[in-house]
Amino acid sequence: MNRKYYFNNMWWGWVTGGYMLYMSWDYEFKYRLLFWCISLCGMVLYPVAKWYIEDTALKFTRPDFWNSGFFADTPGKMGLLAVYTGTVFILSLPLSMIYILSVIIKRLSVR
């Protein structure tokens, strides 16, 4: 992942995180502060998780698979993209931590 990829994909993380914060702003619930902290982390780590999911998916499939069949440009694809964006946002914190730990372990094992 490079800086250009991060900045091109960070907007969806900010939009999704902003929506989550906006929807929970007026509600009082027990873990509100924790929810806000996780949402803020998700906003920042969204591009890392998206890259990790795409990289993992492309290890098992070819790029042309994602442009044909079920994933062709149809109205149903928009719903699938919304579910994908939500899933990446929810998984951004755990996947980013897994990615960061794997990079650290690889670098330490090379030495």
Swiss-Prot record:
<dbReference type="Pfam" id="PF03526">
    <property type="entry name" value="Microcin"/>
</dbReference>
<protein>
    <recommendedName>
        <fullName>Colicin-Ia immunity protein</fullName>
    </recommendedName>
</protein>
<keyword id="KW-0472">Membrane</keyword>
<feature type="transmembrane region" description="Helical">
    <location>
        <begin position="33"/>
        <end position="53"/>
    </location>
</feature>
<keyword id="KW-0079">Bacteriocin immunity</keyword>
<keyword id="KW-0614">Plasmid</keyword>
<dbReference type="GO" id="GO:0030153">
    <property type="term" value="P:bacteriocin immunity"/>
</dbReference>
<dbReference type="GO" id="GO:0015643">
    <property type="term" value="F:toxic substance binding"/>
</dbReference>
<keyword id="KW-0812">Transmembrane</keyword>
<dbReference type="GO" id="GO:0005886">
    <property type="term" value="C:plasma membrane"/>
</dbReference>
<keyword id="KW-1003">Cell membrane</keyword>
<feature type="transmembrane region" description="Helical">
    <location>
        <begin position="85"/>
        <end position="105"/>
    </location>
</feature>
<dbReference type="InterPro" id="IPR003061">
    <property type="entry name" value="Microcin"/>
</dbReference>
<comment type="function">
    <text>This protein is able to protect a cell, which harbors the plasmid ColIa-CA53 encoding colicin Ia, against colicin Ia.</text>
</comment>
<keyword id="KW-1133">Transmembrane helix</keyword>
